[in-house]
């Protein structure tokens, strides 16, 4: 009897809720929209770099070509390249002005409803976004699997996964430091809590 219970527990770990075809199509549509937006972003970046390169070529190409030797020609070309480079790249100022121009950090709030949503959360970590994950809409077994997947991905990507609530976790990339003092997490109606070790209770 104990052996049968153990097999049932192992099998239930890999079971997921039945996914309807509508949900499958919905997931496929979301992934195609995400791919399109990523492709558009990459295309914009390549256009910007192409515009910068073409501006430099126009500066160089607009000068008349002379066949006479000019000893200062190479020096002038170097100065022009340096000036073009300095105009294209932002200047680094002292620490006070850098603090004022601090880069904004966004935190995405996700409520995964099925295991497949874990990939979307990991994709956000890949692009260095912080994610606050609340597993309140998932079953216990699915939430454990999802958390296991996210924890593994965060370790591969050198991110950090920290528990901040009874069913909430904060996923941060490597360049974000989170200072959480010990918190006493109140149990607000939810009796189960998820833990990193994924042990069955």
Curated annotation (Swiss-Prot):
<protein>
    <recommendedName>
        <fullName>Cell division protein SepF</fullName>
    </recommendedName>
</protein>
<feature type="compositionally biased region" description="Basic and acidic residues">
    <location>
        <begin position="27"/>
        <end position="38"/>
    </location>
</feature>
<feature type="region of interest" description="Disordered">
    <location>
        <begin position="27"/>
        <end position="99"/>
    </location>
</feature>
<feature type="compositionally biased region" description="Polar residues">
    <location>
        <begin position="83"/>
        <end position="92"/>
    </location>
</feature>
<comment type="function">
    <text>Cell division protein that is part of the divisome complex and is recruited early to the Z-ring. Probably stimulates Z-ring formation, perhaps through the cross-linking of FtsZ protofilaments. Its function overlaps with FtsA.</text>
</comment>
<keyword id="KW-0131">Cell cycle</keyword>
<comment type="similarity">
    <text>Belongs to the SepF family.</text>
</comment>
<comment type="subunit">
    <text>Homodimer. Interacts with FtsZ.</text>
</comment>
<dbReference type="InterPro" id="IPR007561">
    <property type="entry name" value="Cell_div_SepF/SepF-rel"/>
</dbReference>
<dbReference type="GO" id="GO:0005737">
    <property type="term" value="C:cytoplasm"/>
</dbReference>
<dbReference type="InterPro" id="IPR038594">
    <property type="entry name" value="SepF-like_sf"/>
</dbReference>
<dbReference type="InterPro" id="IPR023052">
    <property type="entry name" value="Cell_div_SepF"/>
</dbReference>
<keyword id="KW-0132">Cell division</keyword>
<dbReference type="Pfam" id="PF04472">
    <property type="entry name" value="SepF"/>
</dbReference>
<keyword id="KW-0963">Cytoplasm</keyword>
<keyword id="KW-0717">Septation</keyword>
<feature type="compositionally biased region" description="Polar residues">
    <location>
        <begin position="43"/>
        <end position="54"/>
    </location>
</feature>
<feature type="compositionally biased region" description="Basic and acidic residues">
    <location>
        <begin position="72"/>
        <end position="81"/>
    </location>
</feature>
<dbReference type="GO" id="GO:0043093">
    <property type="term" value="P:FtsZ-dependent cytokinesis"/>
</dbReference>
<dbReference type="GO" id="GO:0000917">
    <property type="term" value="P:division septum assembly"/>
</dbReference>
